[in-house]
Amino acid sequence: MKNALFILCLFLFPLEMVAQFENYKMDWTKISNESQYNSEPEWLKDAKFGIYFHWGVYSVPAYSYEWYPRLMFMENRKEYKYHKEHYGDPREFGYDKLVPLFRAERFNAKEWVDLFQRAGAKFGGQVAEHHDGVAMWDSKITPWNVALMGPKRDVLGEYSRELKKHGMKVMTTFHHARLLQRYKNTERPDRPEFWDLYDSHFPYSEEMPTSSNNPMLRLLYGNVTPEEFYEPIWLGELKEVIDNYSPDIIYFDSWLNLIPEEYLYKFTQYFLEDAKKKNKEVAIFRKQEDLPLNVSMEILEKSRKQEIESRLWTTEETISTDSWCFTEDMELRKSEDLINVLIDVVSKNGVLMLNVSPRSDGIIPQEQQSILLNIGDWLKINGEAIYGTRPWYVFGEGPTSQPVGDFENHKEFMKLKYTADDVRYTTKGKTVYAITLGVPEAGKTMTFKSFKKKIKALKIENVSVIGSNQLVPWELTKEGLQVKVPIVQGNNAIVFKIECN
């Protein structure tokens, strides 16, 4: 009965709402002015580092990657073969039948937040809804939610409450713009080879559950009309999360360009007005140019900027070399590489979001925990060179060239290896931090060449290595600032603290 009421309300709702947009006026400048919105919150400028996770029904197979829900329906894909061997033919055992298998029986929000805080994160997030149509909160919009099915727990509620108890900001990420089946079996002459690859997550096939007319299955697989989707589902879920969980950041994955502008505007207006009422600074992350910069912030994926940006920006990395969700064969990245990514991002006026990949039962594997704790150990010593800093006049120097581009070159970014001669700079007050992306040889004289342009302006008082009690011998020359490298422990980046008057 409860599911029937969900569906009845959903399909009666959109008809009365469509007409409201006929005379709807959109003024993106006005919307930010009226809400007195700052798209670059000071707390986020100071925070620098957040941790979030991809975790949901797609974690159950622990195979391939988080697009398993889509690829399991494609007969030419390895995911289809795997699903057929382990669960049954997707025609009979669809993604909907995986939902009860996501039990999260060992999920402990406090343990997760404790871990993220020990790792040095200043905000925490979660994928609120991926492309798969399953909401990770107690939803009245869709029956496909974890409070009603699977774990029967309000995951976002438990997690966000713990974040707030720990004094951490809350981020929710939304990927549900792709849920709507936009083309089904129609022709797309403008994209003859790829029309069904990306714009809709679940492939429409008359042989598969994705084409079912069952009211429940239609909701999960996005087999609904645009009128049934944009207002009551896409926008409705966002409003529900804002009302019930009060996130500080809302992140959108790609494909916002597929959402009609009036719905983007209504979301933005709702979120910013809600923040104003609550007297809180919030942020909206978006990829590409799907929202104006006066109301949003750019986020990159597995890539970074070449130079210092005047506006605050963000990028997301994952703890593995490939999948965002847990898989049995996932290969993990080294903590020292992720520390260097964080340093590089911060030196260019950026913020890093690091993704972790819990198992479907709610355990974050020990190998991932060790990486996080290594990052936290480094930040415990060197955090003053990261948190609350701002870019110097130049981001850094050194022999290593960075790939050009965004996600299309993410594999090249992954291969990037820095040396001890690669340096990144941050600043706070009258202090400049020179961070080497490796450990230089003890006793070596190292020259920070970027200081040669600052000889007349800077009056250096002391140079030291953070974590060491000894002062470092230094000399300001026409080549730059020369320092003698002391003996240091560990294999991670070291920070020279240069105190000026």
Name these PLM-found stretches.
Residues 20-501:
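Mature catalytic domains of secreted/periplasmic carbohydrate-active enzymes
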Residues 1-22:
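Bacterial Sec-dependent N-terminal signal peptides
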